[in-house]
A protein has these predicted regions:
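Acidic catalytic/metal-coordinating carboxylates
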Residues: 65-69, 92-96
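Charged docking surfaces used in two-component/phosphorelay signaling
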Residues: 48-56
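Active-site beta3 strand of CheY-like receiver
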Residues: 77-83, 110
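Non-catalytic signal-transmission and effector/linker regions of two-component phosphorelay proteins
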Residues: 1-36, 140-154
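Conserved phosphotransfer cores of two-component systems
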Residues: 75-77, 100-107, 127-129
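Hydrophobic/aromatic residues positioned on beta-strands within the core alpha/beta folds
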Residues: 112-114
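Short hydrophobic/Thr-rich beta-strand motif most characteristic of the beta2 strand and flanking loop
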Residues: 58-65, 73, 135
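Receiver (REC) domain active-site loop signature in two-component systems and cognate sites
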Residues: 88
């Protein structure tokens, strides 16, 4: 007599695992041609939406919701691009951009912000020898993709 609940993963699990592995290997094959981008914004909905737009535009997009999480992700993801909000708690986007430039000098960086008053942050970065391209939020998806592509051509 068996007490409690029992279940079997059986064929459904095996088929699901095989599909997952096949999708992952297909993604690895595509990734060589697709640029990788890390989207960083503490506004989760905006970060998620931006990443979805960029995925549809041909980028492999990952999301971080703060600067520290972004730095951790970069160690394994190695993005070609970093798109980060400027005004975030703990580590602002300019600080993240500077740290990224020092650790991953080939990563192309674009800042975006919907808040006034970021000029002081950007000026401090400039004094330290770092200058970054800035897009104003809200930004039309086509302008975002266009800006990133022009950044990639530099």
């Amino acid at each position: 007599m068996t007490l409690g609940t029992s279940f079997s993963l059986g064929d459904q699990y095996s088929r699901g695992l095989a599909c997952t592995q096949m999708a992952e290997s297909e993604a690895e094959g595509r990734s060589a041609a697709q640029p990788k981008i890390l989207v960083v914004d503490d506004e989760r909905l905006l970060a998620d939406t931006t990443a979805a737009i960029l995925s549809r535009a041909g980028f492999i997009a990952k999301i971080a919701y703060d600067g520290f999480e972004a730095l951790e992700m970069m160690a394994s993801f190695h993005p070609d691009y970093l798109l980060t909000d400027v005004m975030m708690p703990a580590m602002n986007g300019a600080e993240l951009a500077i740290a990224t430039t020092k650790m991953y000098p080939t990563t192309k960086i674009m800042l975006f912000s919907g808040q006034a008053g970021i000029s002081e942050i950007l000026e401090k970065s400039k004094i330290e020898g770092f200058e970054f391209q800035l897009l104003a939020k809200p930004v039309h998806p086509s302008k975002l993709v266009e800006g990133l592509k022009s950044l990639g051509n530099r």
